[in-house]
Structure formats: structure tokens, C-alpha cells
């Protein structure tokens, strides 16, 4: 039976390789299956290098090889055992598996050793030879002398270890002595580049700050720069300022270097160290100042707005203080005018005029509604709060040059309505409905008062001004209430800040305790 699957068939001289073989011995080789049983033939096998030689007879001086197998085409050698076989041959079989590369025609070899120990020995030797054959391509690589790497510093003279590096002054002297002077120019340019102006350094510092912390920029405003004015900040939003914005707006000027040497140090440091240090330096301070200034600015803005409204009302009535200068009011000595001038008024101490005797407002003094003026609710008009608000309003709205005529009819009428009418929002202490409307409406519904009120008389204009003044007082009351609300909000903010500080202190204390417990 001819074997057509052999790798090499021919006559080769076994003595040709001069080195000693790795292993030799007789092994039975599997040659196929017969009709009733497997066919095993004895062969003399020799392993030398990365080749496996198989002989039919024992090798002699002029022995010729029967088959030669190159172990490069094989993958590994392993034990071959059937699952349900109790034969002694089952314990000594091993195989040599070929590689699964395309075009590889080497056969799988199956051998039967004399004993299991001999089988293990052949498996180990064959696996070692296969590994050596795989690495043969790398071992055969030779490097020619011409292709060696050139070492430009191998033959260079070495500097002694104790020698110092040249200083800048020495380099400047050498550069000035040279003909071209390029070295001197380079050194001077390097020094000029190191000595940057503080403005340029601050611009770079701010640019890097914006790149590192883009979250600080919100709604088109740069939080790293302080706002231009408080009014501009309040026009943008009417709510309380944020915590991060407070910390960056109230922070002092950016840290500038102390001397010129720090510029060169900052420029020479590596970027990673600069970023790491700058992140730590740019953290906001833990002790954030309280936002009292912003709240006070908000309150003062509300008060300024109220003053502006009062000033606008005063400008709308430029002739309100000139009522005493009308010629038809100077020479008139009528009882009706004396009734309104104050001393003979029925709402003052007493009156002897016929109009005051017959006026329904005089009779109203004995009414039960007028007696309620002596009640404790009516006494609240004389409280310090009422007096202070009244004086503040008078100082803001009546101190103009047009309103300095204190004896005019207009001012007396306004004082009369303040004392008797109690329509001002500041006199909130009088909770009685009779207290608010009795005297003023009795006087307004009297026939004498109706005659004075009709037409375009100055008294009608004074009453119109009184209603506008009441509106101004209402605005002032709203400003005072908003100021109180701002104070309450400020107290809440302070309480929240104190709570956050206590939580931070407790966290740091717990962390320090854990570190102390871990350290021993």
C-alpha cells in the first residue's frame, strides 16, 4: 500500500547533521485499519532539531531515512485516549497534530509508546521542538554591521560631573563678543517675554478662569467681574442675589504677582501644574460675606422710587402752594373763610360765628360717633409711629419753595383732613368706621362746604391734591412694608447660612474623627 500523503520521500543521509539528536527510540506507528484490527508497525524514530526522522530499520552508518517531517507544520503533541477502552494500548498512545493552515498537507501522526512514561517523554520533547521550530524564523534574522544604529554621542567628549551650567550673564557676554549678535538678541527677547505687564497677565488669568469654570457664566453676565453698579444688577432681576454671584462679585481684585520674578516663574511652569494650582486658588472663600448690602440697596431703591413718585405729583400741581397769594382771597373777611382758616373752625376749640353755631358739623361734636374719638383706638393717632411717618412725609413733600406758606388755606385744609378725616393709610390704628368718616363727611355734606367746593375754586384743587397725597402715603406704606419683608428675608438668609456652616463644621469634624480612628 503506497503512502501518497507523505511530506518528503527520498533518500537523505542521516549523518549529514553533525549535532547529536534530541531523542531516539523504537515506537510503533499507526499505519491504518485492517479488516478486523488496527495496523501498527515498528519504526525507529529520531528527533533532531526541528525535524522528525522515521526509519524502517535502526540507523546505521549508511542508513537512509524513510520519512522526514518538519515540525513547523505541526501545532502540538498530546495524549490520545479513548473513553471506553480498557486496553493497555490506550494508556500509551499520543498524537502529533498538524496546523490548520490552508495548503498544509502534513498528516496527523499517531504513535504507540512502550510505556506511559515513554509516552510522556516523547510528548514533552516534541512540544519543545515545535516551539523551537516556530521561533526559527526569528532566530535566523541577522543584522548587518552597515545597518546598525548610529550613535552620535558615543564618541563625544563627556563633561565632568562637578561642572556647573553656564549662567545667563556668561551667555550674554559670549553673545556680545560674537559677530552676529543673534544669541544676545534671543536672550533679550526671552527676558522681555518674561516681563509681561500686569494688565496682560490679568487678561490671560481671566481667560483661563472662564475656560476652567464655564458654569460661573450665566444669562450673558460674567460672574468673575464685579457688576458695574447696584442699579444695573437690580434691573436685571428683582429676586435675591445668588450665593455664587455674591461670592464672586464681592471678592477683591484678582491676585496680582508681587514682583517681576513671579511672571517668569508662572510662564516657565508646566501647564498641568499651573491648572492644578489655579483650580485650588480660584475656589471661593468659605466665609462668604452676608448679602446685607444687596438687601439695603433694594430697600433704598424702593424708597427712592417712592420719593420720585412724590416729586412727580408735586410737579403736576405747581400752583398748590400759591393759593394764599390769590388776590380775591386776601381782602375777604367773610365768616365762611374764617370758618376754614383754623382758629374759628368748628373742629377746633370753639366758634362764635353764626355759621359755626348752626353747622351740622358742630352738632356732631355731641354725637356718640364723635365721642369715640376719645377711645383707645383714636389715641393710636398720637403714637410715635404715626408722628414719625407724618413728619417724614411732610419733610419729603411739603419742603418745596411753593409750599412754605404755612398760613395758607390749602395747608390748613390738609391738616384738618389729616386730623379729622383719618383717610391716610398710616392711621391704621383707628378701626372704627365712624372714626374714619364722621367729621369729614359731615363737613363735606354741609351746605356751606358744598358752595365752597363747587366750581373751579382753589379749595376743590386742594381736595384733589389731598387725594393724590393719600395715594403717595399709600406708596410710602408699601415701601415700609417691603422693607420689613426684606428684613425678614435677611433674617432667614442669615439663619440658613448659619445652618450650612454648622453642617460643614460637623462634616469636617466627622471626617477628622474617621481619619484619627484609621491612623492607629
From Swiss-Prot:
- What sequence ranges are listed for the domain PH? 20-131
Subcellular location per the Swiss-Prot or TrEMBL entry:
Membrane; Nucleus; Cytoplasm
Q: Where is the composition biased (Basic and acidic residues)?
A: 242-255, 333-347, 363-385, 396-418, 497-506
Which GO biological process entries does UniProt record here? regulation of myoblast fusion
Q: Where is the composition biased (Low complexity)?
A: 348-361
CDD domains in UniProt: PH_PLEKHO1_PLEKHO2
Q: Where is the composition biased (Polar residues)?
A: 227-241, 420-439, 509-520
Q: What does this protein do?
A: Plays a role in the regulation of the actin cytoskeleton through its interactions with actin capping protein (CP).
**Cellular component GO terms, alphabetically?**
cytoplasm; muscle cell projection membrane; nucleus; ruffle membrane
According to the record, the residues making up region (Disordered) are: 1-23, 208-296, 313-439, 497-520
The protein's name in its UniProt record: Pleckstrin homology domain-containing family O member 1-A
Q: What InterPro entries does this protein map onto? A: PH-like_dom_sf (IPR011993), PH_domain (IPR001849), PKHO1/2 (IPR043448)
Which keywords, in A-to-Z order, does the entry hold? Cytoplasm, Membrane, Nucleus
Quote the PTM field. Answer: C-terminal fragments could be released during apoptosis via caspase-3-dependent cleavage.
Amino acid at each position: 500500500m503506497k503512502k501518497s500523503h507523505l511530506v518528503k520521500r527520498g533518500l537523505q543521509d542521516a549523518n549529514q547533521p553533525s549535532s547529536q539528536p534530541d531523542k531516539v527510540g523504537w515506537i510503533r506507528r499507526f499505519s491504518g485499519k485492517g479488516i478486523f484490527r488496527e495496523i501498527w508497525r515498528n519504526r525507529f524514530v529520531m528527533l533532531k532539531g526541528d525535524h522528525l526522522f522515521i526509519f524502517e530499520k535502526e540507523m546505521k552508518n549508511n542508513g537512509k531515512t524513510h520519512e522526514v517531517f518538519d515540525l513547523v507544520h505541526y501545532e502540538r503533541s498530546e495524549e490520545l485516549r479513548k473513553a471506553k477502552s480498557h486496553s493497555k494500548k490506550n494508556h500509551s498512545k499520543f498524537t502529533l497534530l498538524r496546523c490548520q493552515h490552508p495548503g498544509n498537507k502534513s498528516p496527523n501522526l499517531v504513535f504507540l509508546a512502550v510505556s506511559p512514561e515513554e509516552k510522556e517523554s516523547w510528548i514533552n520533547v516534541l512540544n519543545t521542538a515545535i516551539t523551537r521550530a516556530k521561533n526559527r524564523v526569528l532566530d535566523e534574522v541577522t543584522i548587518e554591521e552597515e545597518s546598525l544604529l548610529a550613535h552620535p554621542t558615543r564618541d563625544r567628549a563627556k563633561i565632568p560631573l562637578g561642572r556647573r551650567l553656564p549662567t545667563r550673564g556668561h551667555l550674554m557676554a559670549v553673545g556680545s563678543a560674537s559677530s552676529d549678535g543673534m544669541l544676545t538678541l534671543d536672550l533679550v527677547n526671552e527676558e522681555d517675554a518674561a516681563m509681561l505687564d500686569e494688565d496682560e497677565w490679568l487678561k490671560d488669568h481671566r481667560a483661563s478662569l472662564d475656560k476652567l469654570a464655564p458654569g460661573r457664566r450665566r444669562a450673558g453676565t460674567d460672574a468673575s467681574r464685579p457688576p458695574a453698579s447696584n442699579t444695573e444688577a437690580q434691573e436685571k432681576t428683582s429676586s435675591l442675589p445668588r450665593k455664587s454671584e455674591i461670592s464672586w462679585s464681592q471678592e477683591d481684585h484678582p491676585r496680582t504677582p508681587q514682583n517681576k520674578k513671579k511672571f517668569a516663574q508662572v510662564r516657565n511652569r508646566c501647564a498641568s501644574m499651573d491648572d492644578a494650582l489655579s483650580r485650588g486658588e480660584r475656589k471661593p472663600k468659605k466665609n462668604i460675606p452676608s448679602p446685607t448690602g444687596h438687601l439695603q440697596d433694594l430697600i433704598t431703591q424702593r424708597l427712592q422710587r417712592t420719593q420720585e413718585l412724590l416729586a412727580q405729583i408735586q410737579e403736576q400741581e405747581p400752583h398748590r402752594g400759591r393759593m394764599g397769594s390769590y388776590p380775591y382771597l386776601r381782602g375777604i373777611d367773610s365768616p365762611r373763610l374764617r370758618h376754614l382758616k383754623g382758629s374759628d373752625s368748628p373742629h377746633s376749640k370753639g366758634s362764635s360765628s353764626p355759621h359755626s353755631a348752626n353747622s351740622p358739623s358742630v352738632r356732631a361734636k355731641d354725637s356718640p360717633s364723635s365721642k369715640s374719638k376719645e377711645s383707645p383706638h383714636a389715641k393710636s393717632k398720637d403714637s410715635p409711629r404715626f408722628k414719625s411717618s407724618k413728619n417724614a412725609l411732610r419733610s419729603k413733600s411739603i419742603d418745596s419753595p411753593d409750599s412754605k406758606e404755612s398760613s395758607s388755606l390749602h395747608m390748613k385744609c390738609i391738616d384738618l383732613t389729616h386730623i379729622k378725616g383719618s383717610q391716610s393709610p398710616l392711621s391704621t390704628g383707628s378701626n372704627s368706621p365712624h372714626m374714619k368718616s364722621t367729621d369729614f363727611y359731615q363737613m363735606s355734606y354741609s351746605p356751606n362746604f358744598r358752595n365752597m367746593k363747587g366750581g373751579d375754586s382753589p379749595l376743590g384743587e386742594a381736595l384733589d391734591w389731598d387725594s393724590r397725597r393719600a395715594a403717595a402715603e399709600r406708596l410710602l406704606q408699601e415701601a415700609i412694608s417691603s422693607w420689613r419683608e426684606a428684613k425678614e428675608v435677611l433674617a432667614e438668609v442669615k439663619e440658613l447660612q448659619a445652618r450650612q456652616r454648622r453642617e460643614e463644621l460637623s462634616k469636617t469634624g466627622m471626617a477628622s474623627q474617621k481619619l484619627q480612628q484609621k491612623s492607629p
